[in-house]
C-alpha cells in the first residue's frame, strides 16, 4: 500500500533524523568551502565497464577532498553510506557531514542507492557493491588510495555497511547469492546507530522492503535471513569496527547485540555510547555539526580510521 511515511509512527524517528539532516543545508556555501573542495562525479560517457541495467540514472556520487587538493596525491578514502530506513535519503542530505569528514584528511565518497519500496532488497546492497567496485577500478583518476579504504554508515546505512562487509569477507557464502557482490573489504569501519538484527524487532518495518505488492517475498528465504539475521553470518574476517549508539535511541540495543557477537568472535572493535547527559543527542546525532557530542564522535571515528593507515 502507499504510505505517507511522515504519518506512520514506526517511521517517525527516521523522519525526525531526516529533517535534522535537511537542516544542515542552511549552513550555506561558505561553510562548504571552509571544509573542503567538492569534486562532483557523474556517470561517465564511456560506461562500458558498468552494468548499465544496474547502474541506474540515480546512481551518482560526489567525492569531497581536503582543501589542499594535490593532483599528484592519492587520498585515504571513506565511503559514507547514508541512512533513512532504506526508503529515504540521498547524498545531498549528507553533503556537509561528508565535507566535515573530508576536512580531517580524507577523500569522502557520498553516493545514492536505490530506495524502497520501489526497489526491494537486495537493490541497495547491490548498489553499495557496484559503487565500491567502480571506485576501486577507477582509483587512479579519482585520486583515491584504496589501500587506505574505509567505510561508515548510520542507521540503515550502518546495516548496509555491515551487510556489505559480511558478504565481502565470506567467499563461500558469497558464491551462493544470486545478486551482484564484491569482495573488496575496507581496512576499518564505523557503524553508527545501526539496525543489525531485524528479526528481534517487534514491528514489521522490513516487510515493505522485502515483500512485493501481492504479499510474497521478493527474495529467497536464505537471502531474507542475510537481511533479518545478518549477525549469524558474521565471521572473524570482519574489519576492525568502531560501534556507536545513543542511549536516547530506540535502536541502541541493536548495537549491543553486534558488540556481543563481535566479542564472541574476537573481532577487534570498540563500542561507544553517547547522550547520557545530553537528551538532545538522539538517533544519528553525529550528523548534526552543531552538536558537540556529534563533533566529538566524528573526531573519534576519523582517528579510528587514521590508525589503520
Label each region the model flagged.
Residues 1-309:
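Alpha/beta-hydrolase superfamily serine-hydrolase fold, recognizing
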Amino acid at each position: 500500500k502507499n504510505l505517507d511515511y511522515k504519518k506512520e509512527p514506526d517511521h517517525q524517528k527516521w523522519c525526525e533524523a531526516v529533517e535534522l539532516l535537511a537542516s544542515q543545508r542552511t549552513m550555506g556555501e561558505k561553510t562548504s568551502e571552509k571544509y573542503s573542495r567538492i569534486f562532483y562525479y557523474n556517470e561517465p560517457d564511456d560506461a562500458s565497464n558498468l552494468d548499465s541495467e544496474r547502474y541506474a540514472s540515480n546512481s551518482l556520487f560526489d567525492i569531497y577532498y581536503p582543501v589542499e587538493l594535490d593532483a599528484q596525491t592519492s587520498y585515504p578514502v571513506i565511503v559514507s553510506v547514508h541512512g533513512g530506513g532504506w526508503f529515504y535519503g540521498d547524498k545531498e542530505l549528507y553533503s556537509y557531514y561528508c565535507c566535515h569528514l573530508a576536512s580531517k584528511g580524507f577523500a569522502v565518497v557520498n553516493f545514492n542507492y536505490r530506495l524502497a519500496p520501489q526497489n526491494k532488497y537486495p537493490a541497495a546492497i547491490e548498489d553499495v557493491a557496484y559503487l565500491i567496485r567502480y571506485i576501486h577500478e577507477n582509483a587512479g583518476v579519482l585520486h583515491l588510495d584504496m589501500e587506505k579504504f574505509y567505510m561508515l554508515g548510520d542507521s540503515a546505512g550502518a546495516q548496509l555497511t555491515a551487510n556489505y562487509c559480511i558478504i565481502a569477507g565470506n567467499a563461500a557464502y558469497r558464491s551462493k547469492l544470486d545478486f551482484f557482490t564484491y569482495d573488496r573489504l575496507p581496512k576499518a569501519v564505523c557503524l553508527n546507530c545501526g539496525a543489525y538484527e531485524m528479526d528481534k524487532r517487534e514491528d514489521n518495518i522490513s516487510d515493505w522492503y522485502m515483500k512485493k505488492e501481492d504479499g510474497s517475498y521478493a527474495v529467497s528465504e536464505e537471502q531474507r535471513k542475510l537481511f533479518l539475521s545478518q549477525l549469524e553470518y558474521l565471521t572473524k574476517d570482519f574489519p576492525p569496527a568502531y560501534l556507536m549508539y545513543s542511549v536516547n535511541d530506540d535502536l541502541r540495543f541493536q548495537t549491543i547485540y553486534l558488540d556481543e557477537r563481535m566479542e564472541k568472535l574476537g573481532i577487534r572493535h570498540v563500542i561507544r555510547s553517547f547522550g547520557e547527559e545530553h537528551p538532545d543527542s538522539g538517533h544519528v546525532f553525529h550528523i548534526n555539526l552543531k552538536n558537540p557530542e556529534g563533533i566529538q564522535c566524528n573526531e573519534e571515528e576519523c582517528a579510528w580510521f587514521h590508525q589503520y593507515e
